[in-house]
Amino acid sequence: MKIIGIGDLVLDIYMNESEIKGITGGMSFANVIYNITRLLENYNSSYNNNEGEKIDFETIIYGVCGNDISGDIIIKELESGNINTSYITRKDNKKTREFYMYLDENDNFLTSKKKNYITKKESWYGSSLLKGDIPEELLSKENIYVFREC
């Protein structure tokens, strides 16, 4: 079984008014794929000697991001989670979307925005960079698809 996430990739940046506190790959569809992978790997590892109980699966992201450091971070995180990233397109001269989670002085969540407090810049584009048809080898009735509205 293949579980495929489809959409534009986003880097989530956690920060307060003066510094970045953490970064991680974001966007709901990618988070779902990442968590499904972890859950199924944990499930399979609980059946060490009983191959018949294991679930045969592959998780894949079919998506797009900029050819920049934010895209590098996201892809590295996905690959470290054993997710197939070979269907991610890197766009030159495009910045990967970034979403900012603002924290108070105690690191409690305040709000989220598309604009960076510090630089006052926004790295968000209106329409999806994901263009074209889904590759035929990813199309099957047996697959599960997780979409991001583009």
Annotate each language-model stretch with its function.
Residues M1-K21:
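Positively charged, low-complexity intrinsically disordered leader regions
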Residues I3, F29-I33, G71:
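A general structural signal for well-ordered alpha-helical segments in protein cores
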Residues L9, M27-S28, C65-D68:
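Gly/Ser/Thr-rich beta-alpha loop segments that engage phosphate groups in nucleotides
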Residues L9, T37-L40:
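Generic helix-packing signal
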Residues I13-E19, L40-F147:
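Conserved N-terminal subdomain of the carbohydrate kinase-like
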Residues E19-R38:
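Short catalytic helix/loop segments, enriched in acidic residues and glycine
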Residues C150:
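Active-site beta-loop-alpha junctions enriched in small/polar residues
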